[in-house]
């Protein structure tokens, strides 16, 4: 029987206390999957892009309900949106690789097409606008990143990846692009020309979402491998910290830099709020061995040792806290370990379990994240941190607006990584 370390932490409050997101509004009416949502900060409104080819702007009316103020149909399904509240310009990326720009009326009752670009040969997977340099960025499943001048519409640069682009964030001069192979490419744009800085590789499946904390210079990547990785770009040490709290594909991420929080959501409807103002520990690399590193029993592929000892080979496991390659008998303990990002129970070896039991004061198991079940898979999410509002779209085609002020303002744990 597997041993459970410190069962009491299941009922304990997190480092942020007992705060939870509060549902404020539901917006129904879509007949197809919602691919993107944007929450306005200056007005009470939500942009949506749907597989039914529609781009809609919902505004809050006097009766406290949201109704579509703009309902525009695109030639094909829109895949992503970017909206500038300063310029009232809306960018719409389509499944056929085109990007449209619209001027939105200041009364939010209409939008007028101003131009379009045939940028890519595949679906648009990311859009961005750098106001300071007047550049519009787009990336696509066709493996390319392209940037145009917003003043004259001319293409000024491009870059080709080895895999399909799946997500992008911009903080010039840097551009971060996630791809289908699980890599994050870091580019520096100098005089409109791309320079490869590095390729971040740790995920085992495609990147689904990226978000950037400009205050701490930290990049977060979410993936189909259920994992979130925090890349400390500004630290200069190449440190990366794993966040394990999802049991399905992570679909979208939103950083709250001022509150030092990270919001993540997955395909099963689990919404997580992570405390990023705590000291975290890097996960160890998994060690390789042909025999259990605790009892020396051979693993099932070690045929020579199995034949010599006349024993049946064992399945290999790894201790999540020390990385040792061990057999099932030597790794029969389960525990959370939030400082290493493990918010759900993971397997650890008997030695690590013994140390935790003997010295519980050295292993703080207080949860460092708040889970919240939405009960429908999340397809898109957007945060307005200054308002303390979060918007999500679900697989049930319902848009939800959440009050997350209590989560963002809750006291955190000890600072630092």
Curated annotation (Swiss-Prot):
<feature type="binding site">
    <location>
        <position position="322"/>
    </location>
    <ligand>
        <name>Zn(2+) 2</name>
    </ligand>
</feature>
<feature type="zinc finger region" description="FYVE-type">
    <location>
        <begin position="286"/>
        <end position="357"/>
    </location>
</feature>
<dbReference type="InterPro" id="IPR042234">
    <property type="entry name" value="WDFY1/WDFY2"/>
</dbReference>
<protein>
    <recommendedName>
        <fullName>WD repeat and FYVE domain-containing protein 2</fullName>
    </recommendedName>
</protein>
<feature type="binding site">
    <location>
        <position position="330"/>
    </location>
    <ligand>
        <name>Zn(2+) 1</name>
    </ligand>
</feature>
<keyword id="KW-0254">Endocytosis</keyword>
<keyword id="KW-0479">Metal-binding</keyword>
<dbReference type="Pfam" id="PF00400">
    <property type="entry name" value="WD40"/>
</dbReference>
<keyword id="KW-0862">Zinc</keyword>
<feature type="binding site">
    <location>
        <position position="295"/>
    </location>
    <ligand>
        <name>Zn(2+) 1</name>
    </ligand>
</feature>
<keyword id="KW-0853">WD repeat</keyword>
<feature type="binding site">
    <location>
        <position position="319"/>
    </location>
    <ligand>
        <name>Zn(2+) 2</name>
    </ligand>
</feature>
<feature type="binding site">
    <location>
        <position position="327"/>
    </location>
    <ligand>
        <name>Zn(2+) 1</name>
    </ligand>
</feature>
<feature type="repeat" description="WD 5">
    <location>
        <begin position="373"/>
        <end position="412"/>
    </location>
</feature>
<dbReference type="InterPro" id="IPR011011">
    <property type="entry name" value="Znf_FYVE_PHD"/>
</dbReference>
<feature type="repeat" description="WD 4">
    <location>
        <begin position="245"/>
        <end position="284"/>
    </location>
</feature>
<dbReference type="InterPro" id="IPR019775">
    <property type="entry name" value="WD40_repeat_CS"/>
</dbReference>
<feature type="repeat" description="WD 1">
    <location>
        <begin position="29"/>
        <end position="68"/>
    </location>
</feature>
<keyword id="KW-0677">Repeat</keyword>
<dbReference type="InterPro" id="IPR036322">
    <property type="entry name" value="WD40_repeat_dom_sf"/>
</dbReference>
<comment type="function">
    <text>Plays a role in coelomocyte endocytosis.</text>
</comment>
<dbReference type="InterPro" id="IPR013083">
    <property type="entry name" value="Znf_RING/FYVE/PHD"/>
</dbReference>
<dbReference type="Pfam" id="PF01363">
    <property type="entry name" value="FYVE"/>
</dbReference>
<dbReference type="GO" id="GO:0006897">
    <property type="term" value="P:endocytosis"/>
</dbReference>
<feature type="repeat" description="WD 2">
    <location>
        <begin position="119"/>
        <end position="157"/>
    </location>
</feature>
<dbReference type="InterPro" id="IPR001680">
    <property type="entry name" value="WD40_rpt"/>
</dbReference>
<dbReference type="InterPro" id="IPR000306">
    <property type="entry name" value="Znf_FYVE"/>
</dbReference>
<dbReference type="InterPro" id="IPR017455">
    <property type="entry name" value="Znf_FYVE-rel"/>
</dbReference>
<keyword id="KW-0863">Zinc-finger</keyword>
<dbReference type="GO" id="GO:0005769">
    <property type="term" value="C:early endosome"/>
</dbReference>
<feature type="binding site">
    <location>
        <position position="292"/>
    </location>
    <ligand>
        <name>Zn(2+) 1</name>
    </ligand>
</feature>
<dbReference type="GO" id="GO:0008270">
    <property type="term" value="F:zinc ion binding"/>
</dbReference>
<feature type="binding site">
    <location>
        <position position="349"/>
    </location>
    <ligand>
        <name>Zn(2+) 2</name>
    </ligand>
</feature>
<dbReference type="InterPro" id="IPR015943">
    <property type="entry name" value="WD40/YVTN_repeat-like_dom_sf"/>
</dbReference>
<feature type="binding site">
    <location>
        <position position="352"/>
    </location>
    <ligand>
        <name>Zn(2+) 2</name>
    </ligand>
</feature>
<feature type="repeat" description="WD 3">
    <location>
        <begin position="202"/>
        <end position="241"/>
    </location>
</feature>
